[in-house]
């Protein structure tokens, strides 16, 4: 019994070598980013208020824009884009919003507006590809105003 107890304690130590170890890797990335921030915050590694993550987002956004100056360096662009998304997940945590819910809302809003654009195009007897970007933008602005 004593040996089994020591083995269990050894396994627990291995399992808990980091506060982040309990995060499932299969979570959607945005939710995992949010939960990562929660875990780090739980041990005191966090900004005192929402100003910190907002400043971090601005810093990461600047770095992404700089990386875009070298479009051939796709690895850097991808890394900086990830940093932007991670910083937004942290900011949303600080202001009390679940980023998954916020993103779902934005997607649903886009779907409603896009369907309005499709219906408007259909009412003219044309398909979307025939309208051109200028006309599509007019229909999009109309959808934004109406919905």
List each model region and its residues:
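Flexible "arm" and connector segments at domain edges
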Residues: 1-81, 85-147
